[in-house]
């Protein structure tokens, strides 16, 4: 058993319409952020005769997807009836045999050429569109009028676990022959390829043909048996490659048998899969948390410990805040900063786009809303407002009158019943 790391899937090809660049020129390729980007932008940074860096933007219009076969002569071969009703979506008879034994011995009608056939379709204007199954098989007659995507899946193309990239429903378990759409019980990114013509360079042939459909993580080849296992980085790419390479041939006239691979019993494979899942989860957490917080957790910020030791005491000598208290404080500060930032963005000055009478009306409304100057506004460098200071200046303190002490009467008259007193 031999392990082969395939060469990179992307390559740079120089064309006649490519402008000549200086040796110190750098290229930055960017794609429009629209839902259906019809044009692509290429930024060229070069140095002119004066020694200054010049930035040029080259916009190229995306080409439309071309029909892979002639619509007038296109027809699908219906397999021999083995059931009661034929399902055109799965290309099989329901209620009959799972697979015709002669179907696997028939070569595919066409083959997808990504560099030549891919382009934009009607599906690029619809969010959540699926990929064209006939495009993957190389026999789509609609071209730009197709309602499905005509391109390769990327890491940003995420679908529910019970649906594949072509919009077909998965099943609870795999078929006995490991064919079909697959199961939603686990994420399978590995393909089994059988009936390969055995040669000395079988590893290079398998890597060259299967890297066309996406980035490959790992390739295993059993040279003596003519069998290979190809693992893709993305599950959608493995689903696309399975349909694209089914009943195809490599460098010889063999007819490939492409199936889903079973669970690898090797303990190292289980460890690699667990490690990959942990890396994906860690990357998702890194993107969700602030960069400073992630650097502190990973120990990449040496000043974080000093700052926590100083600020975590909360002014109490010898006190060190627990982790939950410190992280709650950091979370509160982070949320407060986000609220301030959001409020600042909402309070940005409004652009004045009115003209003519609308502008005069807007100015009149603003003038009517202004308050009288000295009575309401406060001084910029004082504590009290202008109105308060004016009231204090006009206030005059009157001298308080001395209280008159009450005159005490004779003791003989106290408590007397005589009215003359």
Curated annotation (Swiss-Prot):
Keywords of the record: Cell cycle, Metal-binding, mRNA processing, mRNA splicing, Nucleus, RNA-binding, Spliceosome, Zinc, Zinc-finger
Gene Ontology molecular function: pre-mRNA binding; U6 snRNA binding; zinc ion binding
InterPro entries, per the entry: Cwc2/Slt11, Cwc2_RRM, Nucleotide-bd_a/b_plait_sf, RBD_domain_sf, RRM_dom, Torus, Znf_CCCH, Znf_CCCH_sf
GO biological process, one term: spliceosomal snRNP assembly
GO CC, one annotated term: U2-type catalytic step 1 spliceosome
Domain notes: The C-terminal RRM domain and the zinc finger motif are necessary for RNA-binding.
Name of the featured protein: Pre-mRNA-splicing factor CWC2
Biological source species: Leptosphaeria maculans (Blackleg fungus)
């Amino acid at each position: 058993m031999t392990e082969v790391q395939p060469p990179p899937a992307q390559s740079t090809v120089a064309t006649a319409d490519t402008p000549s660049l200086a040796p110190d020129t750098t290229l930055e390729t960017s794609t429009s952020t629209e839902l259906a980007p019809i044009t692509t932008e290429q930024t060229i940074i070069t140095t002119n005769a004066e020694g200054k860096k010049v930035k040029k933007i080259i916009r190229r219009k995306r080409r439309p997807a071309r029909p892979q076969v002639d619509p007038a002569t296109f027809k699908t071969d219906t397999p021999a009836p083995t059931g009661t009703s034929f399902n055109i979506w799965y290309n099989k008879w329901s209620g009959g045999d799972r697979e015709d034994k002669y179907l696997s011995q028939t070569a595919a009608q066409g083959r997808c050429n990504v560099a030549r056939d891919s382009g934009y379709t009607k599906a690029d204007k619809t969010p959540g569109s699926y990929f064209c199954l006939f495009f993957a098989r190389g026999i789509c007659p609609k071209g730009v009028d197709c309602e499905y995507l005509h391109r390769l899946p990327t890491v940003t193309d995420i679908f529910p676990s019970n649906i594949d990239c072509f919009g077909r429903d998965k099943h609870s378990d795999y078929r006995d022959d490991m064919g079909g759409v697959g199961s939603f019980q686990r994420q399978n990114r590995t393909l089994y390829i059988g009936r390969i013509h055995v040669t000395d360079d079988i590893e290079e042939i398998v890597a060259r043909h299967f890297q066309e459909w996406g980035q490959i993580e790992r390739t295993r080849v059993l040279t003596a048996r003519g069998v290979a296992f190809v693992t893709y980085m993305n599950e959608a790419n493995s689903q696309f490659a399975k349909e694209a390479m089914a009943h195809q041939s490599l460098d010889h006239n063999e007819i490939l048998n492409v199936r889903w691979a079973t669970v690898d019993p090797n303990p190292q494979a289980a460890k690699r899969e667990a490690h990959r899942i942990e890396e994906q989860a860690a990357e998702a957490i890194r993107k969700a948390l602030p960069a400073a917080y992630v650097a502190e957790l990973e120990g990449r910020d040496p000043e974080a410990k000093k700052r926590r030791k100083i600020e975590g005491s909360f002014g109490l000598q010898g006190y060190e805040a627990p982790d939950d208290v410190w992280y709650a404080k950091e979370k509160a500060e982070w949320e407060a900063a986000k609220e301030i930032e959001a409020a600042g963005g909402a309070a940005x000055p409004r652009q004045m786009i009115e003209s003519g009478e609308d502008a005069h009306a807007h100015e009149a409304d603003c003038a009517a809303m202004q308050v009288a100057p000295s009575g309401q506004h406060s001084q910029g460098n004082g504590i009290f407002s202008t109105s308060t200071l004016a009231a204090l200046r006009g206030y005059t303190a009157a001298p308080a009158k001395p209280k008159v002490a009450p005159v005490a009467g004779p003791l003989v008259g106290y408590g007397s019943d005589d009215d003359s007193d």
